From Swiss-Prot:
Domain of life per record: Bacteria
Purpose of the protein: This is one of the proteins that bind and probably mediate the attachment of the 5S RNA into the large ribosomal subunit, where it forms part of the central protuberance. In the 70S ribosome it contacts protein S13 of the 30S subunit (bridge B1b), connecting the 2 subunits; this bridge is implicated in subunit movement. Contacts the P site tRNA; the 5S rRNA and some of its associated proteins might help stabilize positioning of ribosome-bound tRNAs.
Name listed for the protein in its UniProt record: Large ribosomal subunit protein uL5
Gene it is expressed from: rplE
Phylogenetic placement of the source organism: Bacteria, Pseudomonadati, Pseudomonadota, Gammaproteobacteria, Enterobacterales
InterPro entries: Ribosomal_uL5, Ribosomal_uL5_bac-type, Ribosomal_uL5_C, Ribosomal_uL5_dom_sf, Ribosomal_uL5_N
Length: 179
């Protein structure tokens, strides 16, 4: 079992119960899922780019990504409905906790010119979204084999009811928020 999950059950739950005066352990917010999304708009011209992006996402997440397709045609972007334009992965359970641990302890500190993550990226319901400009911050990606530096979106979905609860949950995991 992931160390971060044990830490959540042993320490974070107690900390949040006292901070927000919850009556039951089930009221304490928890991390529900982590979604990784990589948009590859250039895939319209070259299908190999999407395969490489999917391979990178599979290496980062540890599971096969789902190819996302365009919902509608947009002439300005030269895409038609149904064209493959990206890939995404939804992590839950054990893989989610392992990825979350790697994200906090290894990947985020490797971001170039890192000064902390914005504490304003919550959506109003306790979910946190962040963007990563280059996938090479993850140790699973071999820098020499990367054909193109790509970014990805990471969304951490929690059961928190408000941004304050979500912020307290992530801060309890020592999430590196900007001061």
């Amino acid at each position: 079992m992931a160390k971060l999950h044990d830490y959540y059950k042993d320490e974070v739950v107690k900390q949040l119960m006292s901070q927000f005066d919850y009556n039951s352990v089930m009221q304490v917010p928890r991390v529900e899922k982590i979604t990784l999304n990589m948009g590859v708009g250039e895939a319209i011209a070259d299908k190999k780019l999407l395969d490489n992006a999917a391979a990178d996402l599979a290496a980062i997440s540890g599971q096969k990504p789902f190819i996302t397709k365009a919902r509608k045609s947009v002439a300005g972007f030269k895409i038609r409905q149904g064209y493959p334009i990206g890939c995404k992965v939804t992590l839950r359970g054990e893989r989610m906790w392992e990825f979350f641990e790697r994200l906090i302890s290894i990947a985020v500190p490797r971001i170039r010119d890192f000064r902390g993550l914005s504490a304003k990226s919550f959506d109003g319901r306790g979910n946190y979204s962040m963007g990563v400009r280059e996938q090479i911050i993850f140790p699973e990606i071999d820098y020499d084999k990367v054909d193109r530096v790509r970014g990805l979106d990471i969304t951490i979905t929690t059961t928190a009811k408000s941004d304050d609860e979500g912020r307290a949950l992530l801060a309890a995991f020592n999430f590196p928020f900007r001061k």
